[in-house]
Every structure is written in structure tokens, then in C-alpha cells.
A protein has these predicted regions:
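Short, structured motif recognition centered on aromatic/hydrophobic residues
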Residues: 3, 20, 44, 51-54, ...
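Core segments of cupin and vicinal oxygen chelate
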Residues: 8-50, 93-96, 101, 105-109, ...
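Short, conserved charged micro-motifs
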Residues: 15, 84-89
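Short loop/beta submotifs within extracellular cysteine-rich repeat domains
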Residues: 16, 24-27, 50-51, 59-62, ...
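Regulatory and interaction patches adjacent to catalytic/ligand-binding sites
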Residues: 66-67
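Vicinal oxygen chelate
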Residues: 42-43, 79, 88-137
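N-terminal beta-strand motif that seeds the catalytic metal site of vicinal oxygen chelate
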Residues: 1-17, 72-81, 131-137
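Amphipathic alpha-helical interface surfaces
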Residues: 62-63, 87
């Protein structure tokens, strides 16, 4: 297991990306739209992890709702796991409140699932499986 990325919510990626690229020297790995989450994503590698900038593409997206309640900032921490189904089952068996009962396709074609902050001490946790999923690794 390792930290795959930190998700940061922002109203517009263009308004903040220059800080990460110009001020810190990070490079944008890629951007994409994740249709089912109604979000635009920009990934910026940093060491063995990444910063994931999240911009809502719709007023009813989860990121838009987050921004309305809390403003921009850290939205979630993503932990990379080898077997997401097993990790979800273990969390379920230990009483965690799962947002996603089953993994789904997320950014970069990875399998993802979220665990509710009430089970993690207040942090939205994303589980990510990158291997053998849509060519991602």
C-alpha cells in the first residue's frame, strides 16, 4: 500500500495549476474528464505520488457540492491497493461505512471506491487499484 494521490478540489483548475507548475516546478501528467463523477481532473506527479486537481463539470457534481460547503482544498486521500475487492471486503468486515459497495472505473481507468469520512477520522478515503485495469499501471 502507498499514497497514490491527494485530491484537491478547486472551482477552476486553470486558476491554481500555475502555482503547482510554475512555483513548484511540477509537470502536468495529463488531464481528463471523468463523466460519471462530473469532474475534470489534472494529475501532477510529485515524488512517488501525485496531486490530483479536481474541477466540477456540473453544478450537481460531488466536487461542486464539496466546494459549496467547504470551499477549495483537500478533498480526499487516495491509497493504492493491490486488490481493491479484498480491501473493500476487509473494510466492510471491520464496520467501515462504504460509499461505493463495489469498485468502479475512475481517473486513468483505475478501479476506485470511496470510504466515508465517519469511518476514517474525518477524511474521505479513496481506494485505488492501478494494475491490470485498462492498461494503467
Amino acid at each position: 500500500m502507498k499514497i497514490n494521490h491527494l485530491g484537491i478540489a478547486t472551482k477552476k483548475i486553470e486558476d491554481v495549476i500555475s502555482f503547482w507548475t510554475d512555483s513548484l516546478g511540477l509537470e502536468t501528467m495529463h488531464t481528463e474528464i471523468v463523466e460519471d463523477q462530473k469532474v475534470r481532473v489534472a494529475m501532477l506527479p510529485i515524488g512517488e505520488s501525485r496531486i490530483e486537481l479536481l474541477e466540477p463539470t456540473s453544478e450537481d457534481s460531488p466536487i461542486s457540492k464539496f466546494l459549496e460547503k467547504r470551499g477549495g482544498g483537500i478533498h480526499h486521500i487516495a491509497i493504492e491497493v493491490e486488490d481493491i475487492a479484498a480491501a473493500l471486503q476487509k473494510a466492510r468486515d471491520n464496520g467501515a461505512t462504504l460509499i461505493d459497495q463495489e469498485p468502479r472505473i475512475g481517473a486513468e481507468g483505475c478501479l476506485v471506491a470511496f470510504i466515508h469520512p465517519r469511518s476514517t477520522g474525518g477524511v474521505l478515503l479513496e481506494l485505488v487499484q492501478t494494475t491490470d485495469v485498462g492498461g494503467a499501471s
